[in-house]
């Protein structure tokens, strides 16, 4: 399975002056933890990192220190996650040999090899899927008015799932979806939303509670605790 990792974001919400994936987490950069999990997944045969050229020297240092068994290629990312994935999908499509692809946020460094393998196996049966977990909290749909944020409705919680990554798709369809998005001016926050706009089915594979997306400094604290616990259990 080919894996694309969007890694071109900034560290603004993390309060960092550099790409947050280069920040240290329990002894190594965040991106290194993500790569380590993907490398240990038996189904992953190639990894493409979508990043800005300015970050390539730092990423190359990370790769040199890790000695991964899976081939890794640096690809230029875009100004947004959507543009980065578009470029990665275009690259793979032009190869003419790739049928399916997984996409995984670089900031989800706690995903396990088992999750990558589970998504890869499920993708052999469907054209689109995402990792996800059932929502535990009651969710409110709101609208901001003159007096503040007002609740408009409460969706039925039993039907709500929190989207994670990896997300996987048949490559030819994902390329078609991204080209349509470019033509129509669609802006989405994940690739599954493009399939939804086109009326194509996307299925859910059970994700992991610990598969956090590191966005704020508090997320770093939680991630360090989770990784520390895993290391202690592995001793």
Curated annotation (Swiss-Prot):
Feature type site, description Positions MEP for the nucleophilic attack: 157, 213
Pathway field: Isoprenoid biosynthesis; isopentenyl diphosphate biosynthesis via DXP pathway; isopentenyl diphosphate from 1-deoxy-D-xylulose 5-phosphate: step 2/6
Site-annotated residues for Transition state stabilizer: 13, 20
InterPro entries: IspD, IspD/TarI, IspD/TarI_cytidylyltransf_bact, ISPD_synthase_CS, Nucleotide-diphossugar_trans
Statement: the UniProt record of this protein carries the keyword Nucleotidyltransferase: yes
Nucleus recorded as keyword: no
UniProt-recorded name of the protein: 2-C-methyl-D-erythritol 4-phosphate cytidylyltransferase
A single BP term in Gene Ontology: isopentenyl diphosphate biosynthetic process, methylerythritol 4-phosphate pathway
Catalysed reactions, semicolon-separated: 2-C-methyl-D-erythritol 4-phosphate + CTP + H(+) = 4-CDP-2-C-methyl-D-erythritol + diphosphate
GO MF, any single term: 2-C-methyl-D-erythritol 4-phosphate cytidylyltransferase activity
Known role: Catalyzes the formation of 4-diphosphocytidyl-2-C-methyl-D-erythritol from CTP and 2-C-methyl-D-erythritol 4-phosphate (MEP).
Superkingdom, natural source: Bacteria
EC number annotated for this UniProt entry: 2.7.7.60
Family, similarity comment: Belongs to the IspD/TarI cytidylyltransferase family. IspD subfamily.
Keyword line: Isoprene biosynthesis, Nucleotidyltransferase, Transferase
Gene3D superfamilies: Spore Coat Polysaccharide Biosynthesis Protein SpsA, Chain A (3.90.550.10)
Pfam families reported for this sequence: IspD (PF01128)
NCBIfam families hit by this protein: ispD
């Amino acid at each position: 399975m080919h894996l694309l990792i969007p890694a071109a974001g900034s560290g603004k919400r993390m309060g960092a002056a550099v790409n947050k994936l280069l920040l240290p987490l329990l002894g190594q950069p965040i991106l290194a933890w993500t790569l380590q999990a993907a490398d240990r997944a038996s189904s992953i045969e190639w990894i493409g990192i979508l990043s800005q050229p300015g970050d390539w020297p730092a990423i190359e240092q990370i790769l040199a220190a890790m000695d991964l068994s899976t081939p890794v290629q640096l690809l230029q990312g875009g100004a947004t996650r959507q543009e980065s994935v578009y470029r990665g999908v275009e690259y793979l499509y032009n190869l003419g040999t790739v049928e399916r692809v997984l996409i995984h946020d670089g900031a989800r460094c706690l995903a396990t090899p088992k999750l990558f393998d589970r998504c890869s196996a499920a993708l052999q049966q469907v054209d689109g899927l995402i990792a996800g977990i059932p929502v535990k909290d009651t969710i409110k749909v709101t609208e901001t008015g003159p007096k503040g944020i007002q609740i408009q409705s409460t969706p039925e919680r039993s039907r709500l799932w929190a989207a994670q990554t990896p997300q996987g798709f048949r490559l030819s369809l994902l390329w078609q979806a991204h080209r349509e998005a470019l033509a129509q001016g669609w802006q989405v926050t994940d690739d599954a939303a493009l399939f939804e706009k086109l009326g194509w089915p996307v299925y859910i594979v059970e994700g992991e509670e610990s598969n956090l997306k590191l966005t704020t400094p508090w997320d770093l604290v939680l991630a360090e605790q989770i990784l520390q616990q895993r290391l202690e259990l592995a001793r």
